[in-house]
């Protein structure tokens, strides 16, 4: 297995231009495909998850041109549902941001009735999709499970989404609601979506609604408890769509600045539509000096203190707080993060296991993690297992800010969202 060892870093300084957001990139591609008109998507992320979406769209008859550096994509919109001529099987890797929205979009009524199979890597077959499928079936969709009930692979017949009253469980993943919201404007009738349980990761729903507005569709949001979507609408191309820099990817660099220097990230700022921009607020609460601009966020070292906080609203960036916590005074508790368990790996168990290898004292709860800080001279050099999870690899790079090296196994797993991460990280590092 490939590995990379990061030597101890004495300080960090510099500016990082962020790659495009994964969440925004895949939403933009799908909305552009369903819209009337041609859309030029710029600052598109070049990563595995985006490639899976692009390959699927091509197989579904969407025509597009991708620039040589793969960051600009011009998409000819279909002006409605996918027009599939033959039965198809689409492989989506471990890309939840492709699997969930495509599951819903492929239920929309095509000119010719076809069956589409959606499948992926072994981990994808362990990632739940029951709540989305249940909701789509209530709206009249034809979906069946091919292996285990509640999990991909799925067989979908594009017979249409009728609409009507639909209940969806919001407690596991906001991507289920995102998928439903993006497809129901093209349903035959109006849809009223009622949320069961506590809706997790609300800022990701805000991203979805903002992007739908950019493509000409409005949704009535009643306090995140009920959503009303008019049927028989059309998405309209905005002609150009700029993908913001990835706020989750910003977290590693901002944390590094807060721990040991000064780092600025560009491509997101105070007006970003991404909830993970609020990661900077958490760092500020811990004591870091944060500066906000229109198109940048800067984090600067100050003594950090532990924090006890519900981080349901920033689940991806919250992982970075878990490794940052080792450098703070006092314990840190990250709460209400059950959905870590249904991500690329069971992130709660993975995080607790790998932090203990470094020497940290950690308590893993069903939906929380409690971390005690570690004196700089007590960090242990460990081989960090990444579980084919890009965020594990990137979070644990921060361990090199101690007096101890860290070895990251399978570093190329960052290709899911940030293939050049380790090169970019090295640019801000001053070695001991």
From Swiss-Prot:
UniProt-annotated catalytic positions: 316
Broad EC category: transferase
Binding positions for 3-phosphoshikimate per the UniProt entry: 22-23, 27, 173-175, 201, 316, 339, 343
Localization of this protein: Cytoplasm
InterPro entries linked to this entry: Enolpyruvate_Tfrase_dom, Enolpyruvate_Tfrase_sf, EPSP_synthase, EPSP_synthase_CS, RNA3'P_cycl/enolpyr_Trfase_a/b
GO molecular function, one term: 3-phosphoshikimate 1-carboxyvinyltransferase activity
A single BP term in Gene Ontology: chorismate biosynthetic process
Pathway: Metabolic intermediate biosynthesis; chorismate biosynthesis; chorismate from D-erythrose 4-phosphate and phosphoenolpyruvate: step 6/7
Source taxon at top rank: Bacteria
EC id: 2.5.1.19
Alphabetical keyword list: Amino-acid biosynthesis, Aromatic amino acid biosynthesis, Cytoplasm, Transferase
UniProt-annotated binding residues for phosphoenolpyruvate: 22, 96, 127, 175, 347, 391, 416
Pfam family, one: EPSP_synthase
GO cellular component, one term: cytoplasm
Catalytic activity reported: 3-phosphoshikimate + phosphoenolpyruvate = 5-O-(1-carboxyvinyl)-3-phosphoshikimate + phosphate
Function: Catalyzes the transfer of the enolpyruvyl moiety of phosphoenolpyruvate (PEP) to the 5-hydroxyl of shikimate-3-phosphate (S3P) to produce enolpyruvyl shikimate-3-phosphate and inorganic phosphate.
Family of this protein: Belongs to the EPSP synthase family.
HAMAP family documented for this protein: EPSP_synth (MF_00210)
Quaternary structure annotation from Swiss-Prot or TrEMBL: Monomer.
Name recorded for this polypeptide: 3-phosphoshikimate 1-carboxyvinyltransferase
Species for this entry: Haemophilus influenzae (strain PittGG)
